[in-house]
Amino acid sequence: MKLNITIGIPTHKRPKLLKRAVNSLIYDENINVKIIISVDGIDNTFEEYKLIEKSVFNKKNISFIYHETKIGSLKNFLYLRDICDTEYFMWLADDDESSLELVCELQKLLDNNLNAVTAVPYWELKNEKNEYKIIQSSHFNDQLKIKRVFKYIYDSDDVFFYGLHRAEKLKKCSFNNYWWPNKDALSNWCYVFQMDLILQGQIILLDNTNLRWINHDYGIKYYPRSSGEKMMKNFSYIMRRINIYYLYILKFLKWKKYIYIIIFILPFIFLLARDIIFKEPVNKRIKF
């Protein structure tokens, strides 16, 4: 099968973890898939990144891009999407792992389901003790758009962000920023971004537990979060939840789904109250 895929790996200050991510994708060069690694800013880890680049120099499909100054995590993610010139695109975090066998199966699934915009695998979550859980990723294969939206806003993880996407559809997704005091924070931004995918088509699951995206949920994260002071943190959280539902309404306007604003206004109020009382995500707290 001919692959027509770009895998984008954004990275910042984590060359050792990046090496593991790249090694998970080493494969037969006859398979047509691009791997683009975007290094966010030249700093004291530059030489380590260059050593990784040198170690894969014979892999013509792997390329490194170095941003002279730091552009930030969000811009680095979107940069990789925007330079994609293949039919399909997926992100891989620099501290996670995937495989070409998985990517092949995700493409087959999309090729056979033309109404789908994204194919997502099972999710293996690992902690610092190397304990892991295999989790079925949230997916939304309903033909009715309104049913997908209901299910998404009620109870979802953001794992399908790391699925395989039709690049044309993904390039229509957007996120700018939150209001103050979360203007520089990125917590939950994927949920807003992914609403564009939900409104464009189905999100389908690769039903094979042997092929999994591996998420290492530990280590230092180099992106801005909400304020750490307790009172301010609680205020920031409430404002962010309000902001997210407001941004969902803007998505409905963007896709001319005006009736959805009327339909979802009461559910949004209910869900906002739920989020404030119980915190989020309600049904996705995972214990090892």
Task: Report each predicted region and the residues it spans.
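Acidic donor-binding segment of Leloir-type glycosyltransferases
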Residues: 25-65
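Short aromatic/hydrophobic "clamp" motif used to bind/position activated sugar donors
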Residues: 89
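Conserved donor NDP-sugar-binding/catalytic core segment of glycosyltransferases
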Residues: 101-134
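Catalytic beta-strand/loop signature of glycosyltransferases that borders the donor
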Residues: 122, 204-211
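Short, flexible, basic/aromatic active-site loop/helix in glycosyltransferases
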Residues: 136-156
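A short, conserved alpha-helix in the catalytic core of glycosyltransferases
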Residues: 169-173, 181-207
